[in-house]
């Protein structure tokens, strides 16, 4: 059956009267205007488009799995080269890349708008990548970094930055080489992708559409079923995310699809997620954000330090959160209650001897004050009652009555405030999902399945995740680009 592109021959096929009906119904695609958004409003739109064709004698019948138009004695297939499941970071990058390679593409997106998870990343600012060296990038990927060598080589942080700047999104680099839009608006990143879709006539988005099955024949992809209708294509990309933030559409469908097609999925776990503490005192400091502290994660069973970094963290009603905690959580391979502990150095710029000297000076300046009222220059107000309680020193005790032993205990507490890790917070609160489709079954150069011809994976569905700082979005963009080039 001859294939035509979405817009290539429809002017010849349809007269303007029929074209106007298509456009007015918002069906399938705004074929006629380069300045009109080529996005379908919902999964029923293709059906409405086909009904218009039937009404105008352009299609003999409307079988659920038939998507072609008839001109004279010739039936012309209007199905795409590629179907992409999921309009997130990886899916969008793959779609734009494939379209630029001359492929016709349909994105099936569950939500009313693409990029829903992008809108909330980086606290609504969208940390699009990390402007670091190649070596630094892979140092920040604790899970299966070698698998990403080829994809990152083909599309690195500089490529991502150039992509958005070419779409009129100026970027800036902040502390830790984190790259954000100058506007600090994640919305601008999503708008940039929408703009990229808009001006690529071979790329359309079907929104509010739920894919329920991937079709195969003889170990090769033939299409998908979405909202009860079969759509055919020789290439299908699973880019529907993990299981974190399910309200954005990432509810684990990609893992189910992979398993149904014979792929192994490694155990899923929350990654980059807040931690629940055994200690109740964290609740007393709830809402307190600490800057310039050193957080160290230890494995109490082996005695090994798994992670140590200077930065920011936050106390919550359940335990601890913030950038340092999220990154530390990625170093916990499997949660075991009380096996891991977090050690907070509240004064990393001072060694123990220097800090003790500082305490002696502060105590001398406040010799007649109650202990609890002497720490204002040393600690945030919300943390003082916690430290006093943990030190074992009576808060009403006069400073000039505090013994050397008590002072040393206080000093050691300030250098090693310990939180015992009870558990991860639920996976739907995680920034990313750890685990995923087994990398041994994916071609690292193309992201194509080694089991099913024409099946591809990109983004969070793959068993590869990184620390905070823009690294996970870079993985999504790199793997999405690799898939888009190969589809």
What are the residue ranges of the model-derived segments?
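Active-site- or DNA-interface-adjacent structural scaffold in DNA-acting proteins
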Residues: 35-77
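Beta1/beta-strand and adjacent pyrophosphate-binding region of the FAD-binding site
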Residues: 78-90
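Glycine-rich FAD pyrophosphate-binding loop
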Residues: 83, 99-123
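Short hydrophobic core segments
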Residues: 83-85, 108, 211, 224, ...
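An anion/pyrophosphate-binding glycine-rich loop and adjacent beta-alpha core
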Residues: 112-114, 119-120, 134-135, 264-269, ...
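Glycine-rich active-site loop/strand segments that organize a redox cofactor
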Residues: 125-173
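A glycine-rich dinucleotide-binding beta-alpha-beta segment and adjacent secondary-structure elements
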Residues: 207-209, 385-465
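A conserved short coil-to-beta-strand element within the FAD-binding core of flavoproteins
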Residues: 207-220
């Amino acid at each position: 059956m001859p294939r035509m592109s979405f817009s290539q021959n429809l002017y010849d096929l349809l007269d303007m009267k029929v074209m106007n009906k298509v456009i007015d119904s918002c069906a399938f695609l705004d074929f006629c205007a380069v300045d009109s958004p080529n996005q379908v409003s919902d999964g029923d739109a293709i059906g409405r488009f086909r009904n218009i064709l039937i009404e105008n004698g352009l299609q003999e019948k409307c079988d659920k799995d038939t998507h072609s138009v008839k001109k004279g004695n010739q039936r012309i297939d209007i199905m795409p080269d590629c179907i992409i499941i999921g309009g997130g970071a990886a899916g969008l990058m793959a779609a734009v890349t494939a379209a630029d390679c001359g492929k016709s593409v349909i994105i099936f997106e569950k939500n009313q708008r693409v990029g829903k998870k992008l809108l909330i990343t980086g606290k609504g600012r969208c940390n699009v990548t990390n402007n670091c060296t190649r070596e630094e990038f892979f140092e920040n990927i604790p899970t299966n970094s070698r698998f990403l060598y080829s994809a990152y080589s083909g599309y690195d942080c500089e490529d991502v930055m150039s992509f958005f700047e070419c779409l009129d999104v100026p970027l800036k680099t902040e502390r830790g080489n984190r790259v954000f839009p100058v506007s600090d608006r994640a919305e601008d990143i999503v708008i940039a992708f929408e703009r990229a879709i808009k001006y690529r006539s071979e790329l359309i988005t079907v929104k509010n559409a739920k894919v329920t099955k991937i079709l195969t024949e003889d170990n090769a992809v033939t299409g998908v079923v979405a909202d009860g209708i079969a759509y055919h294509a020789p290439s299908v990309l699973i880019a529907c995310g993990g299981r974190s933030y399910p309200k954005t559409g990432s509810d684990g469908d990609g893992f189910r699809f992979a398993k149904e097609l014979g792929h192994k999925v490694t155990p899923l776990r929350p990654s980059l997620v807040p931690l629940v503490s055994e200690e109740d005192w964290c609740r007393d400091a709830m809402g307190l954000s600490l800057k310039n502290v050193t957080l160290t994660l230890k494995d109490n069973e082996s005695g090994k330090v798994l992670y140590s970094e200077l930065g920011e963290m936050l106390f919550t009603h359940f335990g601890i959160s913030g950038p340092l905690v999220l990154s530390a959580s990625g170093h916990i391979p499997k949660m075991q209650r009380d096996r891991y502990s977090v050690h907070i150095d509240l004064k990393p710029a001072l060694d123990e001897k220097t800090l003790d000297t500082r305490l002696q000076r502060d105590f001398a300046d406040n010799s007649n004050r109650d202990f609890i009222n002497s720490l204002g220059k040393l600690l945030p107000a919300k943390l003082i009652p916690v430290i006093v309680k943990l030190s074992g020193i009576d808060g009403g005790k006069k400073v000039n009555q505090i013994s050397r032993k008590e002072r040393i205990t206080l000093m050691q507490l300030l250098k090693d405030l310990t939180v015992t890790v009870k558990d991860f917070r639920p996976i739907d609160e995680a920034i990313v999902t750890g685990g995923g489709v087994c990398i041994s079954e994916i071609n690292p150069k193309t992201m194509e399945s080694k089991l099913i011809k024409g099946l591809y994976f990109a983004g969070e569905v793959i068993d590869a995740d990184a620390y905070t700082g823009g690294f996970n979005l870079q993985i999504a963009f790199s793997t999405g680009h690799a898939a888009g080039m190969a589809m």
